[in-house]
A protein has these predicted regions:
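Positively charged n-region of N-terminal signal peptides that target proteins for export
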Residues: 1-7
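Bacterial N-terminal signal peptides
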Residues: 7-19
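Cysteine endopeptidase catalytic domains of the caspase/legumain-like
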Residues: 19-300
Length: 300
């Protein structure tokens, strides 16, 4: 299919969904350590800000810290089930840690949320277009339970055995606010476009760090599994606001600085076993403060 046809189909998909509502639910789960808690919460906050900028009329719910409980998630999805119509769309973003021991679980304060339970909650929502973006460790382990017709699945890892902390979330969130992710220039970032953006950035991260990649993201839109196709390409995750889509040089500098600090934190954690505990804590604290400062500037 040539690029002009792909762009036409993309524009048609956006046009068809103008009068439908999109329900966004972003959850930053349990970090386990202060640095993860802070970074997960920052990513959730950044996502919320981007969504409110580009989709002010959408239904947006964000859970982080002590509010990211299984009970609150169940209640939020219950509200969506009561309000959504078949033509609507649902976008679920999971940020944090996951585990897989025969079944996948998303780590939360209090009881965890299993992939099977999440699937059951989503199955009650009448919206026929659904996207689940699971950026946690071991996230691929939940795909089998979550598969359903018209549901797009994106996971940071291919299987449940990839259990290390992931960086995919950072680049997925970045894709939502970066006009360059809209490769067909139709005014929206599709699930496929955001996935390819984040996948490419994740691969580059490990190459630049000269580290073996411990995460291999996948996207699928068939109940039988396998590679994604037209459904993912024509699912607009976010329509870009024309007034704010133009690149801001000052923001680009801050985003580059944030990425640099994030990378320094990752490098420090990678070298943790080689450092004295007090030195590690001091350096980590310094970097986390810098990350918070940069994010505060970005949020202005």
């Amino acid at each position: 299919m040539n690029r002009s046809l792909m762009r036409l189909f993309g524009l048609m998909a956006v046009a068809l969904t103008v009068h439908a509502n999109t329900f966004y639910v972003t959850i930053a789960g349990l970090g386990g350590e202060p640095d993860y808690e802070q970074r997960f919460a920052l990513l959730a906050s950044e996502t919320e800000k981007t969504l409110k900028t580009h989709a002010p009329d959408a239904s947006i719910e964000t859970f982080k810290g002590p509010d990211a409980t299984r009970a609150n998630i169940r209640a939020a999805l219950g509200r969506i089930a009561a309000a959504a119509k078949p033509q609507d769309a649902v976008v679920i973003l999971l940020i944090g840690h996951g585990t897989f021991e025969g079944d996948y679980k998303f780590n939360l304060p209090g009881p965890d949320l299993s992939a099977q339970e999440l699937a059951e909650l989503l199955n009650k929502i009448p919206a026929t277009r659904q996207l689940v973006v699971n950026t946690t460790s071991a996230s691929g382990g939940g795909n089998e339970a979550l598969r359903k017709a018209n549901r797009i699945l994106i996971s940071a890892t291919k299987t449940g055995s990839e259990k290390n902390a992931t960086v995919f979330a950072r680049f997925w969130v970045e894709a939502l606010g970066d006009p360059s992710a809209d490769t067909d220039k139709n005014g929206s970032v599709s699930a496929m476009e955001a996935f390819r953006f984040a996948e490419r950035k994740t691969k580059s991260f490990y190459e630049e760090q000269k580290r073996l990649s411990t995460e291999h993201a996948v996207i699928e839109d068939s109940p039988k599994g396998g590679a994604a196709g037209q459904l993912a390409m024509n699912f607009p995750v976010l329509r870009l606001n024309a007034e704010t889509a133009a690149a801001d040089p000052a923001k680009r500098v801050l985003q580059a600085k944030r990425d640099q600090v994030e990378t320094q934190i990752d490098q420090l954690k990678y070298q943790k076993s080689l450092l004295a505990p007090e030195l590690y804590r001091t350096q980590l604290s310094k970097l986390l403060l810098e990350l918070a400062r940069v994010q505060e500037e970005l949020d202005k």
